[in-house]
Amino acid sequence: MNESKPGDSQNLACVFCRKHDDCPNKYGEKKTKEKWNLTVHYYCLLMSSGIWQRGKEEEGVYGFLIEDIRKEVNRASKLKCCVCKKNGASIGCVAPRCKRSYHFPCGLQRECIFQFTGNFASFCWDHRPVQIITSNNYRESLPCTICLEFIEPIPSYNILRSPCCKNAWFHRDCLQVQAINAGVFFFRCTICNNSDIFQKEMLRMGIHIPEKDASWELEENAYQELLQHYERCDVRRCRCKEGRDYNAPDSKWEIKRCQCCGSSGTHLACSSLRSWEQNWECLECRGIIYNSGEFQKAKKHVLPNSNNVGITDCLLEESSPKLPRQSPGSQSKDLLRQGSKFRRNVSTLLIELGFQIKKKTKRLYINKANIWNSALDAFRNRNFNPSYAIEVAYVIENDNFGSEHPGSKQEFLSLLMQHLENSSLFEGSLSKNLSLNSQALKENLYYEAGKMLAISLVHGGPSPGFFSKTLFNCLVYGPENTQPILDDVSDFDVAQIIIRINTATTVADLKSIINECYNYLELIGCLRLITTLSDKYMLVKDILGYHVIQRVHTPFESFKQGLKTLGVLEKIQAYPEAFCSILCHKPESLSAKILSELFTVHTLPDVKALGFWNSYLQAVEDGKSTTTMEDILIFATGCSSIPPAGFKPTPSIECLHVDFPVGNKCNNCLAIPITNTYKEFQENMDFTIRNTLRLEKEESSHYIGH
């Protein structure tokens, strides 16, 4: 019995479903017997209603004799599929008096259930088994315990509930992939590890559990890294000056692992744990058990400086380096996720995207006086990879000595975003839309702009905050589902035409205005027959649609492609509410309280100097200083606002015996002077910060002039 090579079988159709697809997870193994010119999908053969396995496993195809297969194909050729209306429907619903027949792929399409056990029964969409819950106390979405995507806890074909754990819900696709990988020996409830009850219910609901060993058991040294204890602090603000990986047993800097997953950790001091015996759960596990009531009973360890925030905000931690596998149908469930109580925080989403960043570093040579062109050259370099960690070195153009000095990545990204906001690629005052710049289009700058925005967000840069709601909605919902408004029109002449048309009070006035603007309306294809005054509204809608959306269609598509870098656009479309806050709105104004909590003390503090520091922040907020909160943050970090993904490393304060403050933007460190009086402290701080920022601006202007 010669079997064709796998590559050859792809061109042959299954004798039952007539499909060429070779997809083992969906249709089972595709096998071809050259001797009898026969190709079948395993599931198509197994689920056919008129055939039985009369031979041994090695006989025929999986124990199904060739003559029996021929008879079944002949029987099915007389039956019409009730889905695709073609002959060859070999599978029938087993419900009494139900005469529906269908192909296996068609049955999957119509959400039929195939039971891979017993008599291998098949049920159509009207008679398929369902899961029944006596009462539904789930008012909020719950996560699938495999992929962690949020789902509505209502049993359906695509959503299944564990029979042994009331809070365990799954996507059907997630369960099927899990079953194929785990096999009959390891497929069990992800919460309680029950095997018997769980497998019986899943078989009843049409999950195929193959009789084989788990895939990881067949792989040498699989999951070897799990044999190592996890030792890293993942809380949002680690207070250990030795770093997140530091672990000192029997001290406050000992790493405590999550009691649920063991794949996330915290220093005892960073989560206010008094002893190692205290329980602690990571953010992901705490969110899963919240609705079960266990979360409310557990002792809450709130992160420092987290007053007046919601329950999910106060528990925001830096995600551990484990990425949940996305289910195949996850994108279609985004709307369900948006209605969830656990709306994702944008900083957490960006931190997740940041897991793509590798340890390998790429150094960018940036000329601060020509930030755009030097950034463009760096990002277009064939050796540049967006997933590499970025290191910045500042250089001076036409410097014969070739000198360079270390630069702040966040300062560079902040300057780049400022330039982008004021560039000719966008138009508008505060809320901006894409402009139509033929030269920029020719040079592919819209793509580069989108790419820069994506890189900035993932690598810890500032939030743009200048998108109009129209541009944002086009990115999320598509231009065809977005209606521009008058504020989106930055061209004064076009805006005046729209205003005149919209304020016309009679049909005669409206026709007169259209005659005056005839050439323009004809050029943009918006001429229409006017019969009533209400026709002006459709005309205005057409003009707005052309000027704001259709006119810039090509730049928009290019910009959109750039935003796909590192998966940013997909995240924006999945969590529009979260990203709207940073793309369409400027960050909140800084205050003395925010800066005081932002900077942590990493060295032995001088109590007097720290008191002066807090008094100075309050004086700046009250307008009693020549500097601003933004000036202080720029001086220390290079950024005028807190990036959505947070600072790395966390901004810190040092008290040194120096006369003037020193800002280290590469390390986000501010050294404050130790002085005898507060007056001297404020004068030295004001003088240094004000003049340092002024000199930096003058240097940039000087280089630009040359």
From Swiss-Prot:
Residues 371-698 form the HECT domain. Keywords: Apoptosis, Cytoplasm, Developmental protein, Metal-binding, Nucleus, Repeat, Transferase, Ubl conjugation pathway, Zinc, Zinc-finger. Its EC number is 2.3.2.26. A zinc finger (C2HC pre-PHD-type) spans 11-51. GO terms for cellular component: cytosol; Golgi apparatus; intracellular membrane-bounded organelle; nucleolus; nucleus. A zinc finger (PHD-type) spans 79-128, 143-193, 237-286. The gene is G2E3. One of its GO terms (molecular function) is zinc ion binding. Induction: Up-regulated approximately 4-fold in G2 when compared to S phase. Down-regulated approximately 3-fold by gamma-irradiation. It is found in: Nucleus, Nucleolus; Cytoplasm. This is G2/M phase-specific E3 ubiquitin-protein ligase. Changing C258A: Strong activity. No activity. No activity. Predominantly expressed in brain, liver, kidney, testes and ovary. E3 ubiquitin-protein ligase which accepts ubiquitin from an E2 ubiquitin-conjugating enzyme in the form of a thioester and then directly transfers the ubiquitin to targeted substrates. Essential in early embryonic development to prevent apoptotic death. GO terms for biological process: apoptotic process; protein ubiquitination. Disulfide bonds: none annotated. It catalyses: S-ubiquitinyl-[E2 ubiquitin-conjugating enzyme]-L-cysteine + [acceptor protein]-L-lysine = [E2 ubiquitin-conjugating enzyme]-L-cysteine + N(6)-ubiquitinyl-[acceptor protein]-L-lysine. Ubiquitin ligase activity is mediated by two distinct domains, PHD-type zinc fingers 2 and 3. The use of these distinct domains may allow ubiquitination of different targets by each domain. The HECT domain is catalytically inactive and does not contribute to this activity. Pathway: Protein modification; protein ubiquitination. It comes from Homo sapiens. Changing C261A: Strong activity. No activity. No activity.
